[in-house]
Design a protein with these regions (language model features):
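Single conserved hydrophobic/aromatic residue that forms the stacking wall/gate
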Residues: 197-207
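Conserved catalytic scaffold of divalent metal-dependent phosphoesterases
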Residues: 5-14, 55-144
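N-terminal active-site segment of His-dependent metallophosphoesterases
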Residues: 1-44, 119-122
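Binuclear metal-dependent phosphoesterase catalytic core
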Residues: 6, 15-17, 77-81, 152-156, ...
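Proline-aspartate-enriched helix->loop->beta-strand connector
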Residues: 49, 123, 149, 153, ...
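Active-site regions of enzymes building and remodeling cell-envelope glycoconjugates
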Residues: 29, 48-52, 67-75, 183-184
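Active-site neighborhood of phospho(di)ester-bond hydrolases with catalytic His/Asp-centered motifs
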Residues: 5-7, 29-34, 52-57, 126-129, ...
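Metal-dependent catalytic neighborhoods of phosphoester/phosphodiester hydrolases
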Residues: 16-17, 35, 39-48, 60-69, ...
Length: 207
């Protein structure tokens, strides 16, 4: 399965200079948050594949104008062609507002998923906006990651953990790829493509 991950900044190549051939072979698009809802609607319409999304900390506008034709996977395990995507959007709470959570609040969200996790026998791809604590995160309150994400990775060993929130312009804080045990960690800032094999085959590929 060829997956296009997006986060935080709209790609001019994909929007202003859209060419269908740039999406050849893409099976599904996944947004990790903080993207214009019109951008997401445009992509799912023009590319003609499902688009899954979680909320970033700046996505309160989705309440008024959600991304049309797209699928919100907040607190859900969405299965597509045998691949299970678990969505947990939002950032560490740093001011009053929506799509922000304390460490305790995010832990509570995860605990409520116990039955879905049991029924689906875990998940393959963890899709979040925020990184995990101590993994690709920042030192400031806003960009501190969630510790419960580390526990999810340790317990369920997903193929991928994909997040946004930490931009390339942040310098040393930006790490595109990492590995934690059996899990590949991806910062999806702007765009990132990976090929996830759904049957025994060579290791997954990245672009």
């Amino acid at each position: 399965m060829k997956i296009l991950f997006l986060a935080d900044e709209e790609s001019k190549m994909y929007w202003e200079y859209f060419k269908k051939e740039d999406f050849k072979g893409i099976d599904i698009i996944v947004s990790c948050g903080d993207l214009n809802p019109s951008y997401l609607s445009f992509l799912t319409t023009m590319v003609g594949v499902p688009l899954l999304y979680v909320h970033g900390n700046h996505d309160d506008k989705y309440n008024v104008k959600p991304p049309e034709g797209c699928i919100c996977i907040e607190d859900e395990i969405y299965e597509y062609e045998g691949v299970r995507f678990l969505g947990l959007g939002g950032s560490n709470r740093y001011k009053p507002g929506e799509n922000q959570y304390t460490q305790k609040e995010m832990t509570k969200r995860v605990k409520k998923l116990w039955w879905k996790l049991k029924r689906k026998n875990g998940f393959d791809v963890l899709v979040t906006h925020s990184p995990a604590k101590g993994l690709h995160d920042g030192e400031d309150t806003c960009h501190t990651g969630f510790d419960v994400f580390n526990r999810l990775i340790e317990q369920y060993k997903p193929r991928y953990f994909v997040h946004g929130h930490v931009h390339m312009s942040y310098g040393r804080q930006f790490i595109r790829l990492d590995k934690v045990g059996e899990t590949t960690v991806i910062n999806a800032y702007e765009k990132y493509i990976c090929l996830l094999y759904t049957s025994p085959s060579p290791r997954d590929a990245h672009e």
